[in-house]
Amino acid sequence: MVALYDYYKNSISKKLMLNFNYSSVMQVPKIDKITLNIGVGIATIDKKNLDFAISDLTKISGQKPLITKARKSIASFKIRKGYPIGCKVTLRGNRKWDFFERLIFIVIPRIRDFRGFSNKSFDGKGNYSIGIKEQIIFPEIDFDKIDRIRGINITITTTALSDREGYALLSAFNFPFRT
């Protein structure tokens, strides 16, 4: 099992249960899934860019990404409905905990000029979204073998009912929020 999950089960869930006065352990918020997304707008011009993005996301997540397609045609962006414009991965179970542990302890400390994440990126229901500007901060990506710098959107979906509960959950994991 993953050490971070054991820490959640044995320590964090008990703290949250006391702080929010939950009557059942099932009410305690938990991390439901983590979604990684790379948008490749240049894929309309050159399809190889999408292949490189898929390769990067496969290395980072450990599973094959789903290709996202345009929902409608937009002439100014030169895309048509059904064009592949990105890729995404949804992590659950042990892969979710492995990725979250790597994110907190390895990836985030490698971000240049990092001062903490904003606590305003919650969506109102306890889910948190992060935008990372460079995929090269992940140790799985070899700097010499990339074709270009790409950003990655990371969404941490929780079972929390409010932003306050989601913030308390992520703070308990020592997630680096700006103070």
Swiss-Prot record:
Q: Which GO terms describe its biological process?
A: translation
One Pfam match, by short name?
Answer: Ribosomal_L5
Q: Which domain of life is it from?
A: Bacteria
Q: Which Gene3D superfamilies match?
A: 3.30.1440.10
Report keywords, A-Z: Ribonucleoprotein, Ribosomal protein, RNA-binding, rRNA-binding, tRNA-binding
Q: What GO cellular component entries does it have?
A: ribonucleoprotein complex; ribosome
Q: How does it assemble?
A: Part of the 50S ribosomal subunit; part of the 5S rRNA/L5/L18/L25 subcomplex. Contacts the 5S rRNA and the P site tRNA. Forms a bridge to the 30S subunit in the 70S ribosome.
Q: List the protein's name.
A: Large ribosomal subunit protein uL5
